[in-house]
Amino acid sequence: MNLKVISRNVGFALLASAFFMFLSILVSLAEGNDSALAAMIISFTITFIVGVFPFIFVRKSSNITLKDGYMIIVLSWLLSFVFGMLPYLLWGGPFSVINALFEAVSGYTTTGATILTDVEQLPDSLLFWRSSTHFIGGLGVVVFLLLIIPSSSPMRLRLTNMEVSSLSKEGYRTRTNKTVWVFAAVYLGITVSAFLCYWLAGMTAFDAINHAFSVVATGGFSTKNLSIASFDSNAINIITIVFMFLASVHFGLIFVVFATRSLKPLKNPVLKFYALMIVIASVMMAISLKMKGPEFSWGDSIMNGIFHVVSSISTTGFAISDNNTWPAFAAVLMIIISVPCGMAGSTTGGVKADRIYLMLKTIGQQVKKALHPASINQVHVGNHILTNEEVYPHLVYIALYFVTIAISVALSIVSGVTIDASVAACISALSNVGPALGDWGTLGSFNSAPVMAKFIFVVDMFLGRVEIYPILAVVAMAFSRRNK
């Protein structure tokens, strides 16, 4: 491995966090009486020094191997977690080491689960920092790095192919070295649009920027204890639904729609499949809520049904009601739709609707093959014919997802968590959704979780964000070196 390449590029990733820590300091100074000012200054100083250190003492190198790329991705995320927890840890309050780590990982992985029982106790600078970790993690700490690497660099091409899922390249066609800029342009466009809409709908500028950071990353952190419900506004509810959906759609499709001023990309079969899942689940959720009793009118049932289905399937985790007051069917449905999640090429976590669509198409192919053994059946996604070599890794990923869930649930039960809470929390963590059931529901907190369970959820959040494979690659590299 080329340690020079690894250290310099991981340093770049840390500087992205340092930049937003600096912005948090400005927020603290603007507030005037911010108790986290010292914590933010110390955190920024440490992160900036460590991030800039390789540029002073390590010579530049453009050679990058496959192994170097995996190490850059994994270390960029891990060190972002470590330095990202510093503001919480130094400020104190409810942030023990494990709680600070949980909050940081939840932020960067855009999960949105929290250990805080009173979010509104945090000073503005920490609230802004929480939302900033969503913004950084939504685009990806490695993507921030890629934005400053020349497009002609072979390093950029290799890292792009590692960090950007191959599924995300199926929805549209563009040169690989433009992929990162397309994602960044759409990401910033959604952020600015969400901020303006929230602000015009009645949020303060501070709340608007925090919720814009959160919604574009499909994260879920809010500045309020009751999440979106705090604003008690149907306009804000609808704005949130729209932007949660947009942030969960393939960014390439959104880019092409605006670039060509054509709605043709909306005929994408995966997008139609994803939208169909949302419609069916929303109808089921609304009917379930209405059947519970008079506390939910038809209007409330429909709004809650659509909002929470989009919130869960987009892996955002915003809420307008407490799922502990729902009928069991609605609560379980919320967990089930956390598995397929949004589309590849978006900021969502989970298995991705693309893989579920691919799996169903493959099952259909195999059924046809069983009925007509002599026929030649191919998996089509739109106009593209996928080979077995292209399909296989995605089916394996689905299997890996459920194996990871099974192992996590077993370990969580050992830590003292009940079976139903373990299943819900592990699916939520691995899919980067946030809310689960019970005390850890839509308006709850993971503060009561055992330390071991919190650590399990932290690992799940990380695995879900990087889609498992890079972690397995680094572990395999470590074992191969040890056995030499």
Regions found by a protein language model. Give the residues of each.
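Membrane-proximal intracellular helices of multi-pass ion channels
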Residues: M1-K484
